[in-house]
């Protein structure tokens, strides 16, 4: 499906580039879209590992009602050769995920990247984002990220003994607050987390009753040559 691959490529031309291996490994983020009913959201993270230099691409499909991966996902591709490019890893990941991308018509329902706050943004506040659900000057909502100490998993006990979890609080345009996520444990998929940053907000459906918001959280974990950054998507209904 070269045409779809070209479409995906065009979508990400201006995306944040992955950090070089000498400064840790910070994955770039690209949203792939929503299903028409908003019950599925997908995104890609990609980059080059520090230490090994291997290129990778991970494509996640999120059930926005259950806040869980769809069965059989995510698709994780890692090119274990020194001369493999990031584009090659991404092409392989798209090939694996293509049927699901088509089944859910994701490219027809991009949603809105309502706010974006990558690690390169120096705004003095890594834990709060104020955003509008739709560009039509809809009311301003707020997402607040807080961290707290949480016991590391067994594999990370000696690496990050001061591990942390996070909670997310949504503040409506009317000022009402609601907790939408709080870690109870640290999954192994996060590796050994050191800290978190609120990286952005995706929205779908505007301000209607079926609207879906997705908090984008950057997980900062211990890497080989410095901290690494990976993405988590936390969906909720406002």
Each model region followed by its residue ranges:
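Exposed acidic/polar residues on beta-strands and adjacent loops within beta-sheet cores, strongest
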Residues: 22-238
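N-terminal signal peptide c-region/cleavage motif recognized by signal peptidases
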Residues: 18-20
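Bacterial N-terminal signal peptides that target proteins for export
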Residues: 1-9
């Amino acid at each position: 499906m070269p045409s779809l691959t070209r479409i995906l490529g065009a979508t990400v031309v201006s995306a944040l580039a992955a950090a070089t291996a000498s400064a840790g490994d910070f994955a770039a983020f690209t949203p792939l879209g929503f299903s028409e009913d908003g019950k599925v959201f997908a995104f890609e993270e990609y980059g080059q590992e520090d230490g090994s230099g291997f290129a990778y691409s991970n494509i996640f499909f999120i059930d926005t009602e259950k806040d869980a991966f769809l069965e059989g996902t995510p698709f994780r591709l890692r090119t274990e050769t020194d001369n493999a490019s990031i584009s090659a890893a991404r092409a392989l990941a798209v090939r694996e995920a293509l049927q699901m991308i088509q089944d859910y018509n994701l490219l027809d329902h991009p949603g809105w990247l309502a706010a974006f706050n990558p690690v390169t943004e120096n705004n003095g506040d890594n834990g709060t984002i104020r955003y509008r659900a739709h560009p039509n000057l809809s009311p301003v909502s707020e997402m607040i990220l807080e961290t707290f100490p949480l016991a590391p998993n067994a594999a990370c006990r000696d690496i990050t003994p001061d591990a942390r979890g996070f909670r997310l609080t949504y503040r409506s345009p009317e000022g009402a607050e609601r907790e939408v996520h709080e870690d109870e444990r640290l999954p192994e998929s996060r590796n050994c987390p050191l800290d978190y940053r609120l990286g952005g907000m995706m929205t779908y459906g505007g301000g209607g009753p079926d609207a879906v918001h997705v908090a984008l959280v950057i997980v900062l974990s211990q890497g080989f040559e410095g901290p690494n950054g990976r993405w988590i998507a936390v969906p909720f209904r406002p």
